[in-house]
């Protein structure tokens, strides 16, 4: 079994009101990713993603593109920690 990696993502640009969180939830289910995603008051979307290195890399690639209606101007990716068993959409913070 491969070791889990965890990354914190912050997407900026046109990322709210374009189904970014729901798209990420669906992509997480497809990739076997756990963690969470939420809108932030500053207009960005923040996520914490955990899974195999390949799955997390694929999720980061998806987040750089986002759903069709999104325009991701920048994506900040940093190491994170925690242990997650599902993927959830959280409330705006």
How would you describe each model-predicted region?
Residues 1-93:
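Intrinsically disordered, low-complexity, mixed-charge
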